[in-house]
């Protein structure tokens, strides 16, 4: 009897089947390509355990419902599918790797193409799994060096035009903000978008907080995505007896702040120490941020900063000094000497 072969590449859940990552393909006629018509979530683990997975999946279901995408699957079933993908891929992960899930729900074929192309009409549920280190290892220095907050000319799309609480792939305004920051002369810059009234909203995939007089302030949530990590900051702050206030914040409030930080799933929270190159507060990582990141690390049983730094030690790319954690700008190519 021939023993079953072990997977040699990561496995993806694709519409009820487990397929090799290289074989998970969408049709060129899918609405995802036509309109960015996708509800999605991205998660991470700590010590191999998924963090707030149910909350992410509940938001995924809500986003799909708002978009009229018929995702006919319970949160419990989605959890099972996610855990199956992780179990399939764990043998290919290093012992210190964390699992970063990427869960996409596309509408499927546009009605124009239904019954005209020989493929299922959709919707499509795709669950991919890759090492967290890909996302954070080249930006680990931000935990100690801090972020330079930059407000681009691109504005946040207000809730009166597009519901921001729906997490979807149609994020061209994020892309335009990052394109602008790719020409920023400073380093470690992350974009912070303002709304049409000039109030602070969110980063391109992150929420934002400032600290003043030992109180945490964050933009009121009408015009932003209410992040899972944002909610967890509220939980930690309550346990630490730190007041959190949601209110309209202006760029002036950021310049006058004692500390600032971003929250997002892969990084948890990252300090911001400059605003357009000028120091925020003392211009270094502050005590309230330090309390929060230490508490977060204790709760999940992982030293978040040390883990990122350990990943950085294995990187072949070096520091991501560009404008976003996703290295939007291409690194400069070194000219080779001619003989």
Sequence positions of predicted segments:
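ATP-grasp fold ATP-binding core
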Residues: 98-105
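Short, flexible active-site-proximal loops enriched in glycine and acidic residues
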Residues: 53-54, 91-98
